[in-house]
C-alpha cells in the first residue's frame, strides 16, 4: 500500500464487536487477570494498554521499523533512550539541535558522566573524525531545529556501521510522510508526537521507532521501568492525527514555500533557511533524501533582536507560542524561547542569533500567510 493509504489502514480494522471504525479508548489503569500468572495480554497501563498498542504498531509500520514505543513527551522518549547509556558512554551529537535536547544531554553529562561531543554533521568528514574514538550512539536531527540543516543519513549510517555504533535520528520535523530514516539505515527514530503526528496542538507525546525486534524488547523494558507513558486518550488523538498526516504535510509544505519565497531577497532579511529553496546549501540532498521540504521556515532578520520583536508583534496570522506542527501557524523566537537554556555564546556560535525567528507554517491559505509576512516586514 502507498503511504497515504497506510495512514488510514495501518492501524486496526473496524471493531469486530461493535463495528466502530475508530480505535476504542481503553481508559483503564488496570485489567482483570484470570489468575496471578494468567492474563489477556494486559495487566497495568504503564506496562501496556490496548489503545497505545495500536498507536505503537501504526508508528512502527509508518517508519518501516520492527515496532515502536509511545511516551508522554518527546523528551520522555529521549530520557528513556538515554537510560540505556550508563556512565562513561559516549554520544556524538549534531551541534544544531533543539534546546530541550541539549539541556537533557548536558544534565546527563554533568550528573551521570555521559560524554557528549557536538559536531557539525553537514560535513561527513567531521563525523568520520569523531568516530575515530569509540562511541556508543550517533544522535542526529535532520532537518535540525531551528536552522533546518540536513545530515546525509546514508553517509552517516555508513560511517557508524564501521564502528558498530547505533544511529538515532530525530525525525520530528520531517515525519515519516517526508523521510523514513530506518529505510536509510538508522537504528532508532525519535518523535515528538506533539508536533506534526498529532497535528492539532492538543496533545503532548513522544515515540521511539526501532529497526529491530531486539531493540524493541530492550526499550520496552525501559519504557515500563521509566514509566513516561502517554494516556490512552492522548494515544487516540495521535491516531486521529495520523489519518490526515499526508494531506497536512503537503499543505504545510505549500504554506512554507510561499512564506520562504516572500522572505527571500527582502532588504530586512539577512538569511532564509528552508530546504525547499534552491539557495539552501543542501537543497540537492533534500531532494534526494526527502519527499518534501516540511512546514518550517527560519528567518534571520537584519535588525537583530529589535527587528525580530517588531516583526513578531506585527504578524496577525502567526501566533507567538512554543511548539510547531499544528494546523495553525505559530511563530517562535528561539533565543528567548525554545533555546533559552543554551548559553548565548554557544547558541550564537551555532547560528541561533537574537535576530532569528522560526515560523511554523500552518494549513491556512498560503497566499494569506505570505501577505501576513510581507505586511509584518513592511512595518518592522
Model regions and ranges:
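N-terminal glycine-rich, Lys/His-bearing helix-loop that initiates the first secondary-structure elements
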Residues: 1-42, 49
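Glycine-rich phosphate/pyrophosphate-binding loop
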Residues: 25-26, 33-54, 58-61, 330-355
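PLP-dependent enzyme catalytic core of the Aspartate aminotransferase-like
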Residues: 106, 115-117, 313, 329-380
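Conserved N-terminal alpha-helix of the aminotransferase class I/II PLP-enzyme fold
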Residues: 30-79, 84, 100-109
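Conserved PLP-enzyme active-site core in the AAT-like
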Residues: 68-268
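Short, well-ordered beta-strand elements within core beta-sheets of diverse protein domains
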Residues: 238-247, 295-302, 358-362
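C-terminal core of ALDH-fold dehydrogenases
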Residues: 3, 7-21, 306-346
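Conserved small-domain helix->loop->beta segment predominantly found in fold-type I
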Residues: 257-325, 342-348
